[in-house]
């Protein structure tokens, strides 16, 4: 599959978001169950406070990246008043992974944030999720070893996922 930056555009159709979100987060390694209302709330939050970019092959959305303003109350990472943005989701449909879609979406979104005057971008990742950690490291995010967060998975629907896990924070100066 040849990755082309011109295939990235603003994702503004809930159905595109839902298809990718529901597929990615219901399967390995997440195994989460989300209602349509919860997915819509997540979509609306990212549309209201940020932006979602989709990677399209024709009319088909194969993946997306969403980011929104960082609020200090939401995550325990502090940028000392600097304008910062939270990359809340990077999701690619399983059969299109390892083709460079996420690797195209991340720098595209970071360039967009830089042009809006953001000084930092950050992600919150599972500490045992090598695919996410690899994407972050390839894009020069560094881990903040002073900050972590334990998360309980209230949406987990299979026992193959541990009930709690550690989320780590990685950031990048833009």
Regions found by a protein language model. Name each.
Residues 1-38, 54-56, 168:
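Short amphipathic alpha-helix that is part of the acyltransferase structural core
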Residues 29-56, 64-66, 72-74:
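Active-site rim helix/loop that mediates acceptor-substrate recognition in acyltransferases
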Residues 59-64, 85:
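Glycine-rich phosphate/pyrophosphate-binding loop shared by adenosine-nucleotide-utilizing enzymes
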Residues 87-97, 125-126:
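A short, internal acetyl-CoA/4′-phosphopantetheine-binding micro-motif in the GNAT/acyltransferase core
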Residues 92, 98-111, 138:
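Conserved acetyl-CoA-binding loop-helix of GNAT-fold acetyltransferases
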Residues 103, 115, 127-146:
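Conserved active-site alpha-helix within GNAT-family acetyltransferase domains
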Residues 113-125:
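Conserved GNAT acetyl-CoA-binding A-motif
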Residues 148-174:
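C-terminal "cap" of GNAT-fold acetyltransferases
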């Amino acid at each position: 599959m040849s990755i082309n930056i011109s295939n990235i555009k603003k994702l503004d159709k809930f159905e595109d978001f839902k298809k990718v979100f529901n597929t990615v987060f219901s399967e390995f390694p997440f195994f989460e169950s989300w209602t349509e209302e919860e997915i819509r709330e997540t979509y609306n939050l990212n549309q209201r406070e940020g932006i979602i970019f989709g990677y399209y092959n024709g009319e088909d959305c194969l993946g997306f990246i969403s980011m929104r303003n960082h609020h200090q109350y939401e995550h325990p990472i502090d940028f000392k008043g600097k304008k910062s943005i939270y990359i809340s989701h990077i999701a690619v449909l399983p059969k299109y992974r390892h083709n460079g879609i996420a690797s195209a979406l991340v720098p595209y979104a970071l360039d967009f944030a830089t042009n809006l005057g953001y000084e930092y971008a950050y992600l919150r990742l599972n500490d045992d999720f090598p695919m996410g950690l690899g994407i972050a490291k390839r894009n020069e995010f560094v881990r903040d070893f002073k900050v972590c967060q334990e998360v309980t998975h209230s949406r987990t629907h299979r026992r193959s996922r541990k009930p709690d896990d550690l989320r780590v924070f990685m950031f990048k100066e833009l």
